[in-house]
Amino acid sequence: IMEYSKERMDDLMRAYDEYISSCDYIRMSEVYKIIVNMPSRRFWVSDIRAALIISAMMRGKTDLSTMCPLKKEMYEEIYNRVFKLQEEYPELTISELCAKVIAQPAPKFYLTPGSAKVMVCKARKQWIQEKWKRLRLL
């Protein structure tokens, strides 16, 4: 279970709602392709995991070629930001730098459209169930 799954879901639903409300005509096949490439509030990875991968990258001890392309792209973006931040804050550890970087807005969600579709459908189903539960209580 992912550490930030609820927050990531809320952020993805924000992007979904934002995109849907901006459309005159909605093509569901396009929705998920677009929202996964919309900016995200942060990088959806734990600071511990990011620090492990980034420190291994800095030592040349990790093979990113075995990673799925989106994860690889995300870690490369984090690595580039950590590298720049390290010049500004040389006294900080890699863990501290990673924690700062992953809290920054990310250029996208680093999810496949298929994963986003599954997540959005699950969230909408939960939302509908909660709405029905509230209606029954009235």
Where are the regions a protein language model picked out?
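C-terminal engagement modules used by replication, chromatin/transcription, nuclear envelope/ESCRT
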Residues: K117-L138
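A detector of tandemly repeated sequence units and domain arrays
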Residues: R27-I34, T93-K100
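Short, basic interhelical loop/turn and adjoining N-cap
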Residues: V36-I53, A99-K122
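Basic, amphipathic alpha-helix used for nucleic-acid engagement in HTH/winged-helix/SANT-Myb modules
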Residues: I1-S21, M28, K33-E87, W132-L138
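Residue-identity detector for glutamine
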Residues: Q86, Q104, Q126-Q129
